[in-house]
């Protein structure tokens, strides 16, 4: 379906009708504002044709005056020859807006909203329709007219079904303004500050705090896949996204964060082993301490070597607990 300006729906004869009745033709010229003088001059010429030139001129002037005064028609007659309008109902306009918004044709959607003729009295109903308001917000966002976008979002209450898209546009618009002001891309901390400075208006937010933590079932499924393959390819990310209800980007961020946590835990574990190793060697070198061989025998369970090994086990246990705890708190993905 091709949408064009409503003016394209009318041929040129609608603009300049070829009426056989000269009276209707004069009414059309009068409605344009420039035909009264011509029709008056014609009446003057007709009235002064039988006299002399002076009398003819006078009659022409009188005829011109009478012609100029008589060419005006009542408003109800002039309304017949004004530019025709399309009697679109608010529901029809909303349906077109929804279709263009879903197809992503923002340019055509903007032209449709700009050149839309409506029936008298329908403007108020159209301005209250959510689909039309959302379409205007989308056009304002994509054209960079953020002031109009903020005005629409702050002054009209939207249903929960529209909150997600409108919230994303609100935040992205403020991000772009902040980037333009600072002259550089925003980092995570910068975006956090922008969100704090420009909170979501209650017209597109139900007041509930949005949590960035995943549910336990989602985390469990992600851990299972992580143990099988810490580096999933894009197809596996899409498959896992469908299984968990997340987006492929969220899945990729979770795997990336989990790998970083595991690397940090492994590095901390190595540092603890390096710190425990020299102290254990010094304790073995002291007089009166059993040899390393006797430390491995069952009869030396209470030896200093055993205490060092138990300390190592406790350190390893603490590291593993720390690793699991930090890896399982998948927030801010």
From Swiss-Prot:
Residues 73-120 are annotated as: Interaction with TLE5. It holds the Pfam family Homeodomain. GO terms for cellular component: nucleus. Disruption phenotype: Embryos die at birth and lack most head structures anterior to the midbrain, including the eyes and nose. Embryonic SHH and SIX3 double heterozygous mice exhibit a semilobar holoprosencephaly-like phenotype and a dorsoventral patterning defects in telencephalon. Embryonic WNT1 and SIX3 double homozygous mice lack cerebellum and colliculus and have a severely reduced midbrain. Conditional knockout in eye exhibit drastically reduced lens size, cataracts, or absence of the lens. InterPro entries: HD, Homeodomain-like_sf, SIX1_SD. Coiled coil: none annotated. Gene3D superfamilies: Homeodomain-like (1.10.10.60). Keywords: Developmental protein, DNA-binding, Homeobox, Nucleus, Repressor, Transcription, Transcription regulation. Expressed in ependymal cells during the formation of the lateral wall. Residues 57-71 have a biased composition (Gly residues). It is found in: Nucleus. The keyword Electron transport does not apply. GO terms for molecular function: DNA binding; DNA-binding transcription activator activity, RNA polymerase II-specific; DNA-binding transcription factor activity, RNA polymerase II-specific; histone deacetylase binding; RNA polymerase II cis-regulatory region sequence-specific DNA binding; sequence-specific DNA binding; transcription corepressor binding. The keyword Transcription regulation applies. Signal peptide: none annotated. PANTHER family: HOMEOBOX PROTEIN SIX, HOMEOBOX PROTEIN SIX3. Transcriptional regulator which can act as both a transcriptional repressor and activator by binding a ATTA homeodomain core recognition sequence on these target genes. During forebrain development represses WNT1 expression allowing zona limitans intrathalamica formation and thereby ensuring proper anterio-posterior patterning of the diencephalon and formation of the rostral diencephalon. Acts as a direct upstream activator of SHH expression in the rostral diencephalon ventral midline and that in turn SHH maintains its expression. Belongs to the SIX/Sine oculis homeobox family. Interacts with EYA4; translocates EYA4 from the cytoplasm to the nucleus and promotes activation of their target genes. Interacts with MTA1 and HDAC2; represses its own transcription. Interacts with MTA1; facilitates the binding of SIX3 to the core DNA motif of SIX3 promoter. Interacts with EYA1; promotes EYA1 translocation to the nucleus. Interacts with TLE1 and TLE5 (via Q domain); can act in combination with either TLE1 and/or TLE5 leading to transcriptional repression or activation, respectively. This is Homeobox protein SIX3. It comes from Mus musculus.
